[in-house]
């Protein structure tokens, strides 16, 4: 690798961009200089491996990941950067933190048929430490809720040496066993998303698609608890064992928001949710970087900064509405009549007051774009999506406005007047006949 330096992400920029702010504390506690810490972190014999699985997926999260800019995929893994004129090479900033290998990805790896070999290596400890990234929903392969015809399956990760099917459920479960950290990325992998939707009458798809985490609003259990139930009913004893919940020596905790939130990796980390449909690439990249930094002893425990739905607070700590450039219109009770109007789109169905994300503030790619720049928030970062937030383009019944101050009371009055005038004006605009 060339040592040519350019205008890419520096070592200190990389740490800052990852959302980790504890480097100074780490240095103070360890008594090491920055360069000493960098040297200590390097361990070519023990890289941080990334295993990325694709289950019931569309690939949208992978595309978003490839679009990450701060830092970019190329900068992190290869040291390639674009200086505005040509492609350049430099020493990758991630090398300061120890090597990272993307061991497995169904789309990005050089050849297929590697799933089983990767699983075997992971089970044997040959890939330790590794971070497991789950994209796409999991399915009821073992007939806990729905009995499939014999020999059929919903999702395959590949073939075993004997020619039999390697089920996605089996693949992910076995990778969970030795993972240092697990991150679920996208609405489907986190809380089930669109594949787990109902028909409006509470009836689910025969796949009984589920996310890695429970959706308490729709009553859907996450994959860890599903696997535990499968084991208890002896539906797949050769694939799923009791260690699904005894890995940390703790009993099953079914407290809100659900048992799968309390499952822990062997390092004691819960499943981290990178929720959205899909999340922006920078959200995925920076969350994975925080896991890598923690694994290297260079950053704080990511579990200390998660909200109740296991989402990183540095991305999901505020409502989408709070970050929205149209929020001022909301407070004034000024609402858009149609798409293209500059006012608040609450009246057109925006669910920004019911969801958490930084999309309006950070944009989508390199600070550009974002849902509310041209459309409405459909609450894809929240459990309950999509069922609880449909129809997407119908205005909610009533906004929720704080009433503890005079300003809030005045704002509430303005919103009520604004929504009312919007409804009357829309009625006047409606074509007759």
Regions found by a protein language model. Give the residues of each.
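N-terminal export signals
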Residues: 13-35
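Local cysteine-cluster metal-coordination motifs and their immediate loop/turn environment
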Residues: 57-59, 191, 345-348, 370-384
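Extended, subdomain-level signal for the structured scaffold at the beginning of enzyme domains
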Residues: 36-38, 42-172
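N-terminal secretory signal peptides
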Residues: 1-10, 37
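Alpha-helical transmembrane segments
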Residues: 413-427
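Juxtamembrane/start-of-transmembrane alpha-helix segments at the extracytoplasmic/lumenal side
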Residues: 398-410
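Cytoplasmic C-terminal tails of single-pass
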Residues: 431-433
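A conserved mid-domain beta-alpha-beta active-site/ligand-binding segment of alpha/beta enzyme cores
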Residues: 281-285, 289, 293-362
